[in-house]
Amino acid sequence: MRFLFLITPLFFSHITLAATGCIPEMNGTWSLNSYKSLDPTNLAYEVLVFSNTGEEQRYLMEFENKPNERRSLEWSVPCDGKDHPSPDFPWSTAPNATVAITRLGDKSEFVVQKENGRLTTTYTRVLADNDQTMISVGRDADNKVIWVRIFDKDK
């Protein structure tokens, strides 16, 4: 029995665990490149400003859904894969909306939004081009792609 206890860690030592925490390379200002994006809502303007810590994603979002209707919101949530109360998103008015962020790898994360415990939206964010491009692919509750947004990192 003692032999099995000693050898088991060696046997499974090759297994790699998924990255945890938030992605520090996301920190900075990201501007929507509407020419490269596929967005049926025709979002003309969106800027994300990330200031992540090791365990918490923090960002300021400025956006314009309609001409002359620019808005912003600021929020933070742990990157632990658990549901947390969601900020007052303009597109979500449910009092018990939640958001969960799970890091998938060194340069990617998965975000889940729910209202009343039911899935509403998911999106995957991936850093590319030497961390100078962020790709966001959004899906609805039926897993249908609803946007592909490309953001360029401001220098």
Predicted regions and their residues:
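Positively charged n-region of N-terminal signal peptides that target proteins for export
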Residues: M1-L4
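Sec-dependent N-terminal signal peptides
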Residues: L6-T8
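N-terminal signal peptide c-region/cleavage motif recognized by signal peptidases
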Residues: S13-I15
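Hydrophobic small-molecule pocket/channel-lining residues, especially in calycin-type beta-barrels
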Residues: A19-K155
